[in-house]
């Protein structure tokens, strides 16, 4: 099992120049290799097996940057092709834009070429860089690779990928009759409703900061493109987006941590978030809630502790089924926010669904 730690780094001016050169070389090599593959296939109907070494003679500037970063470019391109052949809907590999593509590169650990110490990290070609190491890393973890990235705001980060032994946290054998199971139902407002009494509301960070973001974007639209004021204002807009993103991630990490610590099993409905955002006209609410990201974080945190995330089938009638008597309503409108049953049960619609998801997960686990 792999785990990544992301720390902010503070390169000096000389290192910033080399980082910019590495980002550019990786983008250039990716585009060149992709272009040659396309031309070769058009001419011969065969796939070209090109490598970074084939380009260093024609483009000597590639020798100035980390060779492992260039090797990873080849791996990323091959992965893009594999993803396309596996599922054409993903799309054919695209060329990387100089201004719109993400500025990052990955390098690997070879013969101790990367070293991590308190408040600094040593990287190939860059030597020692100051780093804000805000948490300790277990000595038993094995460092595999480091990804260096630059945000639109101008901040630099190092993502350290460690390998963790799979046998450390084996899934525990619970008595599912008595296990602590939490059911979660997606909600348009507040992100989710829980089967237990957990009061944790999403702050809707994007909407709260929307006015400020709109103000900064209006200022940007009035700047002359390419001027110093334009780039200065563009950075302010990027900082607004970054703050919203960090607030959202902080909320999701803290909430998923609490769930993983408190419960043995967490059950969620296996809904298609992408389809919901496109088809139900709830795009902004769905994206602001980040429910899909929340499920992803919850799953790895539970697995980390030897616990389980159970996905209940999306066609299970969690909202239409009464959590008391089990009867299923044939007609239930989306506007009906309170569930009323003939047995006398009166309950919030989303809470009823969360309880049903919890009990369905328990049934699935007991059935094996």
Predicted feature locations:
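Long, hydrophobic, amphipathic alpha-helical segments used as structural scaffolds
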Residues: 34-41, 81, 85-92, 164
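Stable alpha-helical structural segments in soluble proteins, enriched in small hydrophobic residues
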Residues: 33, 69-87, 351-361, 365
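Positively charged, helix-rich recognition surfaces that bind polyanionic ligands
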Residues: 139, 152-368
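Residues on one face of amphipathic alpha-helical coiled coils
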Residues: 25, 29-32, 36, 76-79, ...
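Generic detection of short hydrophobic beta-strand segments and adjacent strand-loop junctions
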Residues: 7-9, 128-133, 199-202
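Acidic carboxylate diad motif detector
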Residues: 50-152
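Gly/serine-rich nucleotide phosphate-binding loop at the start of the catalytic core
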Residues: 1-70
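Hydrophobic (often cysteine-bearing) scaffold residues that line and stabilize catalytic clefts
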Residues: 15, 19, 26, 66-73, ...
